[in-house]
Amino acid sequence: MNTAPFIAIEGPIGAGKTTLATMLSQKFGFPMINEIVEDNPYLDKFYDNIKEWSFQLEMFFLCHRYKQLEDTSDHFLKKGQPVIADYHIYKNVIFAERTLSPHQLEKYKKIYHLLTDDLPKPNFIIYIKASLPTLLHRIEKRGRPFEKKIETSYLEQLISDYEVAIKQLQEADPELTVLTVDGDSKDFVLNKSDFERIAAHVKELIV
C-alpha cells in the first residue's frame, strides 16, 4: 500500500496527459514520472506495421515503466512524498489487448503480472476524456512525425478501450478515486479556472 498520494493522469493518445501532469507537478512541487515515448526504438516501426512490432513495443514500455515505478516507490512513496505520473501502469494492458495476438497477449499478461503485482498503484486517477476530433487536433498540433501514421480507427478503438479500462480499475479497487475531466469542453492550458478546479481536487487529496 502507498504511504503517500500517488496520482496518475490517463486518457487516450493526445488527451493532454503530460501537459496536465507537468502543470500539477509544478504547482504542488511533486516529483513527476513521465513515460519516455520518443526513445522507444520500436515506435516508428510499430505505426508502419502494428502486427509485426506490437510485442516488442509493449515489452519495451513495460520494462521501462516497471523500472520507473520501482525507483519511485523506493525514493518517494515509501518516504511519504506524493508523486504524479502521466500514465497508469495498466495502460500497458489497454494497448496490449488492442494490438497483440491471443498467443502474444497470454505471454505478455504473465510477464505483466509478474513485474507489476507488487508495484505501487495510483490511488487517484485524473482521466481526461476526449472525443476523436479533439485528439486529432492535439496530435496534429504537437507534431510528432510517427503520430501522423496513427489511423483514425485505432484512436476510436482506444477511446472505447479507455472507457472500459477506467471502469475495470474502479471495480478492482473501490477505494480508488477517479476524477473525469471533459477534454472537449475544458482547456486546462488556456483557461486558468479549468486548471484550478482540477488542482482543487488534488489539494483535497493531499491535505
Swiss-Prot record:
Active site positions, chain numbering: 86 (proton acceptor)
Enzyme class: transferase
Disulfide bonds: none
Binding residues for substrate: 35, 47, 147
UniProt keywords, alphabetically: ATP-binding, Kinase, Nucleotide-binding, Transferase
Assigned EC number: 2.7.1.113
Gene Ontology annotations for the cellular component aspect, listed alphabetically: cytoplasm
GO molecular function: ATP binding; deoxyguanosine kinase activity; deoxynucleoside kinase activity
Gene3D superfamilies for this protein: P-loop containing nucleotide triphosphate hydrolases (3.40.50.300)
Pfam families: dNK (PF01712)
Spans through the membrane: none
Activity regulation annotation text: Inhibited by deoxyguanosine at concentrations above 30 uM only with UTP as phosphate donor. dGTP is a potent competitive inhibitor.
KW Transmembrane (keyword) present: no
pH profile of the protein: Optimum pH is around pH 9 (with saturating concentrations of dGuo and UTP). At pH 7.5 and 11.5 more than 80% of maximal activity is still observed. At pH 6.0, 60% activity remains, whereas the enzyme is completely inactive below pH 5.6.
Catalytic activity entry: 2'-deoxyguanosine + ATP = dGMP + ADP + H(+)
Positions with a binding annotation for ATP: 11-19
Note: Catalysis proceeds by a classical ping-pong bi-bi reaction mechanism.
Functional summary from the UniProt entry: Plays an essential role in generating the deoxyribonucleotide precursors dGTP for DNA metabolism. Highly specific toward deoxyguanosine (dGuo) and deoxyinosine (dIno). Only marginal activity is observed with guanosine. UTP is slightly more efficient as phosphate donor than CTP, ATP and GTP.
Assigned protein family: Belongs to the DCK/DGK family.
The protein's assembly and partners: Homodimer.
PANTHER family: DEOXYGUANOSINE KINASE, DEOXYNUCLEOSIDE KINASE
Protein name per its UniProtKB record: Deoxyguanosine kinase
Gene: dgk
